[in-house]
Design a protein with these regions (language model features):
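A broad, structural surface signal
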Residues: 13, 17, 21, 70, ...
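Glycine- and acidic
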Residues: 1-8, 55, 183, 188-190
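Active-site nucleotide-donor binding segment shared across nucleotidyl transfer reactions
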Residues: 20-57, 61-63
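Conserved nucleotidyltransferase catalytic core and NTase-mimicking acidic/glycine-rich helix/loop elements
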Residues: 131-253
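Helical scaffold of the NTase/Pol beta-like nucleotidyltransferase catalytic core
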Residues: 1-32
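Conserved NTP/Mg2+-binding pocket subregion across the NTase superfamily
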Residues: 66-187
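Flexible, glycine- and charge-enriched loops at secondary-structure boundaries
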Residues: 8, 12, 65, 168
Length: 253
């Protein structure tokens, strides 16, 4: 039996038991959002071998970032629930608590602050993965006043109706443009090319299925996992798996 604890549960306990007591009297927001498999709840025991551990993202007013960061880092225990509170991240060591200002963090991840409004260009320029990172995860505390962290997330929960229809139309067009190609490649004896295009089409259909169900498609490593967790997706997943595993272009079609 695995004793793996999902990162979102670990971080929730870390905030409540360790971080929050260090912030008495400090207005702040706290969450586990942004990059990381645990934010989308796709982490496993394997995830613990890199960039993983008790993590909390703290948001405070800009003028208090340095002060709060120093206070929190000084108060962290060496370990929490058996995990170090300072761990490797892209080859560098850093505390599991990041202290920053909300508006700056949002602009850094998205290119804009959704609390100030989301334009058409904003919607169409942000990758699905970034939208998922901001709207998924969990907010542990939203104490900065309104509009705060939850307001920012709510503004990005899903596309406006007209934008959603445009995004769906674009995705359908991606499928339509290459739909004949597995067969065309096969007709000239290019089984490898047919397989490559077939896999590309499977990826785009997976993304389309998620978009139709109001889910931002994650990047490649988690795309299949996201589809598998979507209710009613088993038949589609089986068909796509058969197409990708096909040994001939006629079977693939």
């Amino acid at each position: 039996m695995s004793d793996f604890v999902p990162g979102i549960e670990l971080s929730r306990a870390f905030y409540g038991e360790v971080v929050a007591p260090l912030l008495t009297g400090v207005a702040h927001g706290a969450a586990l959002i942004g990059p990381g498999s645990e934010v989308l709840e796709f982490d496993t025991a394997r995830s613990a071998d890199h960039d993983w551990g008790p993590r909390v993202l703290l948001f405070v007013p800009g003028e208090r970032v340095a002060e709060v960061e120093a206070k929190v880092v000084a108060g962290l225990p060496e370990r929490f629930a058996g995990f170090p509170t300072v761990f490797g991240y892209h080859g560098a060591l850093r505390p599991g608590v990041t202290v920053t200002e909300l508006g700056g963090w949002l602009r850094g991840r998205l290119g804009f602050d959704p609390r100030e409004g989301v334009t058409l260009l904003d919607w169409l320029s942000v990758p699905w993965q970034r939208l998922a990172e901001v709207t998924r995860g969990e907010v542990f505390c939203d104490g900065l006043g309104e509009p705060g962290l939850e307001a920012a997330r709510a503004a990005l929960r899903w596309y406006p109706q007209d934008v959603w229809r445009y995004v769906l139309a674009c995705q359908w067009r991606r499928v339509w443009q290459e739909e004949p190609f597995p067969g065309r490649c096969g007709e000239v004896g290019d089984e490898l090319g047919s397989a490559v295009v077939g896999a590309r089409l499977a990826r785009e259909v997976m993304r389309l299925a998620l978009l139709l169900r109001r889910r931002y498609p994650p990047y490649a490593k988690w795309l299949g996992s996201a589809l598998a967790r979507m209710p009613g997706s088993a038949e589609l997943a089986e068909s796509l798996s058969s197409a990708v595993a096909a040994r001939s272009w006629r079977e693939r079609e």
